[in-house]
Amino acid sequence: MTAASHVGHLRFGFPESKPHTSNEPYVFIQATRQNWTGNIFIDSESQEVSGSNPQRQDYALGPYRAPGFSGYFVSRFSQPFASYGITHGASLQANTTEGTGEHLGAWVKFDSSCNEVEVRTGVSFVSIAQARKNLDIEAPSSVSFDDAVETLKEAWLEKLDRVQIEGVNETAAEYDQRTIFYTGLFHGLQYPSDFSEPLETIEGGRRTWYEGYTDQVREGEDSYYQSWSIWVGHRYAIRVFPDMLTPNRTLSVLNTACLHFSRRNASTV
């Protein structure tokens, strides 16, 4: 498994099927759970499964609702579908290509001779079309799984290598101070997260995002950040060090904070 900013890239290996058995290789995708109505679509010609889900974990934290919020996905498979169908609760609907409701899912099966399948899943908070665009931009067919693994490694090593540690006493492996430090730095560099999505290319160009304060989709020239550490003030203070290592995004983060203030007329920092 590897990833890009808005794409997950998975490689599934299937054991060889035994003769006279029905152990066909398959992948199942859960689209919605109880009390949440979503959609799912199967396109066997393009070898894609797509859908949407309005569930969000913070829905019970306050009176505000976001009727325009949904998470969208497009999963593209490297092998053709031998068969497929929709699950709706306990109901199995073979050869059905779309569904709407709770407890919704989809399965796709492959030829019994298939022993490996790659799945590239683009995600978006804007639309299914944008999820597909994210997939095409960040994980085109020309980029192999192994290429994606190396690109992700290089991206993180470039950031973590900005700090070099010397003179640390070696201790037991599970208490190695360097491991603890770099793990904390890795976690710190993930937030606040860039919530915007590319409209043209990975680097540069206009971007789009879902804005929770207005429950609308927006566009702009800059990135838009979310996932702030605002529960307790000292947690944001801890963020100063990771932010010092990424000065290229500081202006965008501050612009987003000002935008949040203007939208809600209340400071977020």
Segments from the language model and where they lie:
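Beta-sandwich/jelly-roll carbohydrate-recognition scaffolds of carbohydrate-active enzymes
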Residues: 1-225, 259, 264
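Stable alpha-helical elements in mature extracytoplasmic
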Residues: 152, 232, 249-253
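Well-ordered alpha-helical scaffold segments within catalytic/enzyme domains
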Residues: 187, 191, 237-246
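Long, well-ordered core segments of solenoidal/helical folds
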Residues: 192, 247-268
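C-terminal substrate/ligand-recognition segments
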Residues: 225-227, 231-238
